């Protein structure tokens, strides 16, 4: 499925890694969310998303391909019927990884990987994109007339724009140290 990674594998050998990923994917599709280590969750995510993409196709060849990887027919049936219909309108991003802290025994970083089954409303996505575009266009529209106005006033007085430039430079100088202090405070809070 996904291209193999270089370096150490999960569980030792490549065959064991394939079996571990298949079992993790089967557990994910059966329970809709599982708790595992962050490393395993990151390796499982593209594997599971590829299987969901096959399930969305829904044809016999895709079903047989998934059955070659996940041997549990009940889980494959659930993947092709329930999960594929739930993510039908989603164009990817079928899984979500949430870090939950370290395991008590060996302090391994743990994560919850879950299927994203919430419905996607195409209308809401279009509205969100339109509002973002409008928000970006509004400041640009305000800056354009402001630039034209000083050009017209230059003929009358040349000292006024120079005073405005120094005022904007001072304001920018005051904002720059404040911006540098904010990340330092965030690092201290963590």
From Swiss-Prot:
Stretches of the chain forming a coiled coil according to its record: none
InterPro entries listed in its UniProt record: Ribosomal_bL17 (IPR000456), Ribosomal_bL17_CS (IPR047859), Ribosomal_bL17_sf (IPR036373)
GO molecular function, one term: structural constituent of ribosome
NCBIfam families given in the database record: L17
Pfam families: Ribosomal_L17 (PF01196)
Region ranges (Disordered): 135-190
Protein name in UniProt: Large ribosomal subunit protein bL17
Bias type Low complexity, positions: 135-165
PROSITE patterns documented for this protein: RIBOSOMAL_L17
Keyword annotations from UniProtKB, A to Z: Ribonucleoprotein, Ribosomal protein
Superkingdom as given in the UniProt entry: Bacteria
Taxonomic lineage from the root: Bacteria, Bacillati, Actinomycetota, Actinomycetes, Micrococcales
GO biological process: translation
Entry annotated with the keyword Ribonucleoprotein: yes
Family affiliation: Belongs to the bacterial ribosomal protein bL17 family.
Gene Ontology cellular component terms for the protein in this record: cytosolic large ribosomal subunit
Subunit note: Part of the 50S ribosomal subunit. Contacts protein L32.
Signal peptide as annotated in the record: none
